[in-house]
């Protein structure tokens, strides 16, 4: 018997991707177990949306707006996970110290296992998002300075003089544009590094919830006895992902800084040559 069979409310025909279609969306009436079931449904739905956003990274749809939506969805899921974890603890305490029936305890144990499955999928989505956010840069549409058209003048000498002045001004603006490009790239790198740090914190939070979940399930017995064995693998994968994130961020920052410096030097040399020629 699955947890939705114990609900007194309605059944929803929509299957859940994490529990093989077993999970239904229950009506929450204040009972911790019902709230846990509703929380699991909302988390799994949000994780599905998160996966769709992650799959858009590296495509023409990968914009700053998409990255912002990705971060908001990540924070929303983290909040849902925290709330659902708290309700699961309530249900576990009630089973331990109350007069809950054996059927109720089994149903709550299955809820704990469903919650574990959702957390695993969320961890998988976070690792995939972190890898793609480091590998790909979002598409940014920036306005390029427009070229200048020389006005039509009466004499040839005035026309040439005007063209030279416009050319010099255009080259100066190109140097300024290069400076702005360097500043923009540095801001993008800093923003991505901040995002990586936030992802690391969220991964650690989810890993901590795995440990709390294992303790609750152990109190309930051996109904979900495979949770503890997954903790070590989850911790190792999280640690490896964190190390790779930091290495990739450091390498990207070094390469971007060198490229920007070379562009700036080239622009300055070009401006000096033009000024010397014109003088």
Curated annotation (Swiss-Prot):
Q: Which residues form a coiled coil?
A: 65-94
Q: Which residues carry this modification: N-acetylserine?
A: 2
Region entry Disordered, spans: 1-34
Task: Tell me the InterPro entries matching this sequence.
Answer: SNARE (IPR010989), Syntaxin (IPR045242), Syntaxin/epimorphin_CS (IPR006012), Syntaxin_N (IPR006011), T_SNARE_dom (IPR000727)
**Membrane-spanning segments:** 259-279
**Keywords tagged on the record:** Acetylation, Coiled coil, Membrane, Protein transport, Transmembrane, Transmembrane helix, Transport
Q: In which tissues is it expressed?
A: A high level expression is seen in the roots while a low level expression is seen in the leaves.
Q: State the compartments where it is located.
A: Prevacuolar compartment membrane
Give the bilayer topology: Single-pass type IV membrane protein
Per UniProt, residues of the t-SNARE coiled-coil homology domain are: 186-248
* Signal peptide stretch: none
Question: Keyword Electron transport: yes or no?
Answer: no
What's one Pfam family the UniProt record gives for this protein? Syntaxin_2
Ranges annotated as biased composition (Polar residues): 21-31
Could you name the domain of life of the organism this protein comes from? Eukaryota
Instruction: Name a GO molecular-function annotation.
Output: SNAP receptor activity
Q: Which residues pair up as cystines?
A: none
Tell me a GO cellular component: trans-Golgi network transport vesicle
Any single GO BP term: protein targeting to vacuole
Which residues are on the Cytoplasmic side of the membrane? 2-258
**Protein family according to the UniProt entry:** Belongs to the syntaxin family.
Q: What is this protein called?
A: Syntaxin-21
**Native organism:** Arabidopsis thaliana (Mouse-ear cress)
Record gene name = SYP21
